[in-house]
A protein has these predicted regions:
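Juxtamembrane regions of bacterial inner-membrane/periplasmic proteins
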Residues: 2-252
Length: 252
């Protein structure tokens, strides 16, 4: 009896795994086409449009695609300093480096908040929570392009697989180019060019180091936590931290 239970349990688990593999093969996105074709939309953009409709608001999408050569090196450095300092050397996953960098950021931000008399040093998530959510640029792009915000084992597994193939199929420059053109920089603002025009009335190619660090500072959550209108001190503190790291990051 016990042997039969073990047998059927094993077959059941095997069936689930095989079913998941078949589903992945059928629904897996075509990563290779991103080498030469810019994505027309992303899962995140579509989710934001649906959210606006559900609220009864007019959906907004302001986005202008520009090649990486027309995005300021300052912004490239700032984004890597803020989001993924080892982007050029890792293969999609770099949790240890992110943890070390964020621990240092926590210490510096808390110190500066105290000096400014702002008792909001807890604006940076506690390390255990942050570590679970930390992502490299490649991981962020995988989620942004193809996945929902659902938190589940299968979604994280799919994110890991897509990240692996993004790194295998695309160059680092192409990954960074797509990332900088699709990420959200405010309500309905997508991509570096739209963000530059919205915040500074200039092209993304003309951004100064300080302006670039400002845009990088709001990436984690431009609508609430790092909204420059609602939380200017938080944005300014993160901006300063990013500016300190910009000279040391390597761009692809």
């Amino acid at each position: 009896m016990l042997r039969r239970i073990i047998k059927y349990t094993f077959l059941g688990l095997l069936g689930i795994v095989l079913g998941w593999i078949i589903f992945e093969l059928i629904t897996f996105p075509n990563i290779s086409q991103l080498r030469d074709h810019n994505p027309e939309t992303t899962s995140m953009i579509e989710a934001r449009l649906r959210e606006a409709q559900e609220r009864g608001d007019q959906p907004k999408r302001i986005q202008t695609w520009v090649p990486l050569e027309k995005i300021s090196v300052n912004l490239q450095r700032a984004v890597l300093a803020g989001e993924d300092t080892n982007f050029t050397s890792h293969h999609g996953f770099d949790y240890e480096a992110i943890q070390k960098a964020w621990e240092e950021a926590q210490r510096e931000a808390a110190k500066e908040a105290k000096e400014e008399g702002d008792d909001q040093s807890s604006w940076i998530p506690a390390m255990p929570s942050f570590k679970r959510g930390a992502s490299t640029i490649s991981q962020q792009l995988a989620k942004n392009l193809f996945l929902s915000s659902e938190k589940s084992f299968f979604r994280k597994g799919r994110e890991a697989v897509i990240t692996y193939f993004l790194e295998r199929k695309l160059s680092k420059r192409r990954i960074l180019e797509i990332y900088l053109n699709v990420i959200e920089w405010g309500d309905g603002i997508y991509g570096a060019e739209a963000a530059s025009q919205y915040y500074f009335k200039k092209s993304a190619s003309e951004l100064s180091a300080r302006e670039a660090a400002f845009l990088s500072a709001i990436i984690p959550n431009p609508n609430t936590v790092f909204n420059p209108q609602k939380n200017p001190k938080r944005v300014a503190r993160r901006q300063r931290i990013i500016m300190r790291g910009m000279p040391y990051v390597k761009i692809p």
